[in-house]
């Protein structure tokens, strides 16, 4: 780590905050170099689903997004109420739906689970905003298999993860992106060991 170009002695610990006690000034620049390698976590309490990380970034499936604008008075639920005279047209509801398949398992090599994953770096976006599916400058290509029984539930949300032995379709290349760029997020995947 460097502050204003000078190395700072610090002992960062994974999963912990790093505190720098100093008097800060306008224009101070902090540079932090993080290890950037692929890793995987298994969620035993969530049907042995897996998540993939690239350094400090957790990855999500890249899902095309369909935006539907609605009148906020129609979509208000529970105790959501509008004040009399408020113009709801100035505060529309935007619902986001998947516009591409999202129900994939990850195909993982038994000996080297991340062997078939490929990191692709793209140009930084001209608007300096990397937090959208279209502008994210990092993608990871992987192999997935669709899981047809994993569907949107009756509330319009992603259904419960299927069992590991759920029927899966043919292998396909899929793209993962940093979670912060995805509005619709599948970040815990059923796995398919091959």
Question: PLM features: residue spans?
Answer:
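C-terminal beta-rich recognition modules with glycine/proline-rich loops and embedded aromatic residues
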Residues: 2-3, 9-13, 22-25, 29-194
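Short, surface-exposed beta-strand/beta-hairpin micro-motifs centered on an aromatic residue
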Residues: 17-19
């Amino acid at each position: 780590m460097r502050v204003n170009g000078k190395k700072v002695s610090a002992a960062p610990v994974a999963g912990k905050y790093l505190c720098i006690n100093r008097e800060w000034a306008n224009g101070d620049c902090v540079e932090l170099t993080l290890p950037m390698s692929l890793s995987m976590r298994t969620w035993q309490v969530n049907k042995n689903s897996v998540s993939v990380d690239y350094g400090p970034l957790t990855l999500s499936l890249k899902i095309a997004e369909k935006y539907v604008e609605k009148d906020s008075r129609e979509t208000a639920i529970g105790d959501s109420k509008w004040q009399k005279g408020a113009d709801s047209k100035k505060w529309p509801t935007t619902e986001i739906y998947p516009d591409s398949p999202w129900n994939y398992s990850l195909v993982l090599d038994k000996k080297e689970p991340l062997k078939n994953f490929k990191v692709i770096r793209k140009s930084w976006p001209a608007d300096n905003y990397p937090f959208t599916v279209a502008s994210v400058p990092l993608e990871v290509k992987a192999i997935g298999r669709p899981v047809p029984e994993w569907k949107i539930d009756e509330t319009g949300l992603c259904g419960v993860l299927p069992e590991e032995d759920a029927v899966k379709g043919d292998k396909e290349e899929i793209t993962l992106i940093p979670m912060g760029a995805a509005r619709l997020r599948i970040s815990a995947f059923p796995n398919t060991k091959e």
